[in-house]
Amino acid sequence: MLVLSRKIGQSIIIGNDIEIKILKIDGGEIKIGIEAPKDVKVLRKELYEELLKENKEAVKFDIKNLPGFFKKK
């Protein structure tokens, strides 16, 4: 993991087209701005983890239900 120190107004560039800028520091909270191409998803980690959890739940399948799945109605 790369660890950097930044001050308000300073930025970090990732690749050629992603910029992370420090906008405000207030106590223990830091406000950042992220400029990235529209095709790059930018999510808070807790939201990303929740989406992964929901996706895993959505694909759970109980094999015991398989025989009835193909019955003609």
Swiss-Prot record:
Q: Share what the entry says about its subunit structure, partners included.
A: Homodimer; the beta-strands of each monomer intercalate to form a hydrophobic core, while the alpha-helices form wings that extend away from the core.
- Which Cys-Cys disulphide bridges does the record give? none
Q: Which compartments is it annotated to reside in?
A: Cytoplasm
The taxonomic lineage of its organism, from the top, reads:
Bacteria, Thermotogati, Thermotogota, Thermotogae, Thermotogales
Query: PANTHER family annotated for this entry?
Result: CARBON STORAGE REGULATOR
**Name of the protein in its database record:** Translational regulator CsrA
Q: Which InterPro entries match?
A: CsrA (IPR003751), CsrA_sf (IPR036107)
Molecular function GO labels: mRNA 5'-UTR binding
Gene name linked to the record: csrA
